[in-house]
């Protein structure tokens, strides 16, 4: 990537690469200083090199710099957003890749979640979290040092790229209500049960008529 962006920058008339290189002194200064590897992950893409179609993307741009075509298979059906197609094996594979590539660092999953267009009975999100958490456990069994996991997100929010059109929250936010009422989705009950029992029960069905509370000690 460093060489590719340098070559593209020269061809585009830049005096130097748009991706500044670290000096040897800077590399030495930061080497070994990280406490953990923070990972945001949502889904998986199939990727292949595409140097033969230089006008596929705007120039210069992130996508043009990659020189790749990315796509997802039609059987990855669950998910209203391409960013959150259900591919749990890709999560396990990525965790193993990072572990092997970077000398087995502690990995903190800082974002992982699923987008819908709203609704309380979010069965697809429940399927997603169960599948991805099982994949994470498989990666731990593989020897990956996972030290933490954060679900994205606690409640619906304004997403950088898609505004309010995609909902990631465990809690649904009513944006038509001036009080922005929050209501727990089924996924909130399921994740609470996973944390309470420290296990993933594929058959657990919550009673959503009961209020979702924080239990003492859980």
Describe the predicted segments one by one:
Residues 1-218:
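Non-catalytic scaffold segments within catalytic domains of secreted glycoside hydrolases
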């Amino acid at each position: 990537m460093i060489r590719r962006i340098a070559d593209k920058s020269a061809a585009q008339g830049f005096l130097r690469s748009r991706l500044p290189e670290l000096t040897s002194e800077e590399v030495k200064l930061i080497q070994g200083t990280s406490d953990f590897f923070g990972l945001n992950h949502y889904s998986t893409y199939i990727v292949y090199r595409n140097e033969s179609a230089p006008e596929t993307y705007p120039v210069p741009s992130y996508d043009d710099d990659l020189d790749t075509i990315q796509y997802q298979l039609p059987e990855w059906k669950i998910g209203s957003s391409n960013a959150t197609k259900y591919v749990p094996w890709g999560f396990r594979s990525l965790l193993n890749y990072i572990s092997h590539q970077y000398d087995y660092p502690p990995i903190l999953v800082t974002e992982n979640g699923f987008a819908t267009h709203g609704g309380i009975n979010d069965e697809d999100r429940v399927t997603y979290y169960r599948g991805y958490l099982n994949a994470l456990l498989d990666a731990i069994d593989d020897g990956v040092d996972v030290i933490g996991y954060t679900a994205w997100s606690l409640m619906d929010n304004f997403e950088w790229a898609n505004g309010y059109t995609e909902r990631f929250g465990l809690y649904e936010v009513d944006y038509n209500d001036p009080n922005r009422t929050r209501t727990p989705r089924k996924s909130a009950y399921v994740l609470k049960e996973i944390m309470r029992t420290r296990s993933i029960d594929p058959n657990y069905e919550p009673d959503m008529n009961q209020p979702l509370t924080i239990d003492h000690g859980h």
